[in-house]
Amino acid sequence: SSLDNRGYTCTQTNFDTGLRYQKLDQWAKFKDFQARIRDAIIKAQALNRIMIGWNGTSRAATSNPTTHPLLQDVNSGWLQKMRTENEARVMAEVVADSGKIEIGGGKDFENIDALVVSMVNEFIEPWYQEDTDLVVICGRQLLADKYFPIINKTQAPTEMLAADIVTSQKRLGNLPAVRVPHFPPNGLLVTRLDNLSIYFQDSSWRRHLL
């Protein structure tokens, strides 16, 4: 295989982090007060970057969190990159022009596990299909749809133990299921976690307290 040309453009992104006075008062007595503030800012920015990674679709000159609460207009995220640069590996529908994938008896797939197996078989090159680092990144709702029927009933102790084992493993299509913050609730992404990267310029962070 060959490497594709791909350029990157560094643009300024401003992150706002708010801490309530009540929280600051609670932390004020600790010797690591400044470190706590620093860590809170770093965590908030990291979660924002993850939100952009899953939901970002464009780069606006001035973002608007009111109309784009998931930071869709801050930058193009990983999923948007797939849609625009690797559309052949994106499954948006099974029936042409339906705009949806249906799961259940007599529908596109009998269950979500079959969908994941199909994704691996159809969209991932054969030499990567056996990669033991592949995972399924998914939204909370899809995991709930699979596991809620297992736990939402009265069970004998032996069945409870079996249910605990099944739900603790969290697998879809025999791949580990990974829940991450801000992922689209009804979406799936089969990949290696080290495929996901965020690039920023070294020594380019600036912080201003208001």
Where is each model-derived feature located?
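Generic recognition of flexible, low-complexity loop/linker segments
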Residues: 121-126, 165
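Sequence/fold signature of self-assembling virion shell proteins
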Residues: 72-118, 132-135, 141-210
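Long, contiguous amphipathic alpha-helices that act as assembly "spine/axial" helices in icosahedral shell
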Residues: 3-89, 125-143, 177, 210
